Amino acid sequence: MTDSISPAAPAGNPADNHCYRHPDRETYVKCQRCGRPICGQCQTLAPVGVHCPECVREARGSAPSRPIGRRFVNAVRPGSTRPIATFTLIGICVVVFLLEWVTGLNPLTGGGQSPVEYDLAYFPHDIIHAPWTIITVNFVHESFLHILFNMYSLFVVGVPLERYLGRTRFLALFFVTGIGAVVGVDFFANEPVVGASGAIFGLLGALVIFARRMGIRTTQLYIVIALNLAIGYFVPGIAWQAHVGGLIVGVGLGFLLLRTAAIRRRVTQIAGVAGVAVVLLAALLANALA
């Protein structure tokens, strides 16, 4: 059976006690906006009374919509809770991996020669000739499995940390712990390294400190960290030294950020994080010149 639709009955008409869309249905309820009689099927609950389908459509059509540009500005503005930094880091890693793929990397085995990987990877004691690699090393990955695991970990750890710390502190934590991972490789391993796992271990270390401060049980975090450290140590081809270096720096920065969280200590916090970065860079430079 198909419901028929007829024009609204004028005010005062005897049909006023029948739904304007379904004349065979008696009703004593009217739309709060236009006064049309509407049956239960045609009623949409409003803040005051009920509305008919036409008034609902008109209201939706006239509702102001924010342009895409405005939505983007709101998303990236300081103070936004959207994890833009985390998603940006993941996006850069994916783009770099695709560039590696099209320039010679075998994404399944990690074999092949890619100039992108070669130019962005970190080589021990090479900070003087390729200083950018202490940053770009975080965006290079060797295989599908490598980038999949790291990006999942970055998403799981990065989103809550970015919302807790804010975008600027989160990025500072990521990149400084990444330098800490490079220091671990520079002093205790003599092989090129790629991947964001060292920085992710740094995020995990800081997350443990913040979770303990908030009274959250950290047993599961300890288990995750221990298992991944063990995997890195016993499975060949994984730079566990980077994991340890990033983790140590992450724990230290976690304490620093907590101790200087008050607004009045903002300058102390900035100076402290910058100081840690300078010490790490000095260690790399000294090791390269030794």
Language-model regions, residue ranges each:
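C-terminal transmembrane module of polytopic alpha-helical membrane proteins
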Residues: 1-78, 234-290
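N-terminal TM1-TM2 helical hairpin plus the immediately adjacent luminal interfacial "cap"
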Residues: 82-196, 236-238
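Alpha-helical membrane-inserting segments
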Residues: 95-99, 180, 184, 188, ...
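Short alpha-helical packing/oligomerization segments
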Residues: 126, 133, 224-248
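Membrane-interface helix-boundary motifs at transmembrane edges
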Residues: 162, 212-216, 260-267
